[in-house]
A protein has these predicted regions:
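Short, structural beta-strand-to-alpha-helix junction motif
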Residues: 2-4, 98
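An N-cap/entry alpha-helix motif that binds or orients negatively charged groups
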Residues: 5-29
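Feature captures the catalytic cores and cofactor-binding loops of soluble hydro-lyases/lyases
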Residues: 21-26, 30-47, 51-123
Length: 123
């Protein structure tokens, strides 16, 4: 799924529009506020949905090769976080939606979940 489609589903606002995002292909997603969980399940090319709004989110995305971060519930990262993400070429998006709603919308739209292998659970 293209990142531009995800932004439409999220009714999101791009916080660092200097990054060209329309051709970004996203292969799956993960929703979490625990960055250790993200590192345990996410695969390169994912989008991360989180309510956590600190530099560790960008550092986690950098380490895990996450393509984009969506901040939930109207969270707005500081200018330092936006600058760090822009430097790392990681698009930041903000939405007023909560995690449960946005995860459901994206999954229903066809975005693969990277959380389905927890504790032996499989689709």
């Amino acid at each position: 799924m293209k990142l531009s489609e995800i932004i439409q589903h999220a009714k999101g606002t791009v916080l660092n529009p200097s990054i060209m995002i329309h051709d970004y292909e996203i292969i799956g997603g993960c929703g979490s506020d625990l960055m250790s969980d993200v590192l345990a399940v996410v695969k390169p090319g994912a989008v991360l949905l989180t309510g956590l709004c600190n530099p560790q989110v960008v550092r986690t995305a950098q380490m895990a090769d996450i393509r984009a971060i969506i901040f939930l519930r109207g969270k707005q990262p500081s200018t330092e976080i936006v600058a760090l993400a822009t430097q790392e070429n990681i698009p930041l998006i903000s939405t007023d939606m909560g995690m449960f709603e946005l995860c459901g919308r994206l999954y229903r739209a066809g975005l693969h979940s990277f959380e389905t292998n927890w504790n032996g659970f499989h689709e």
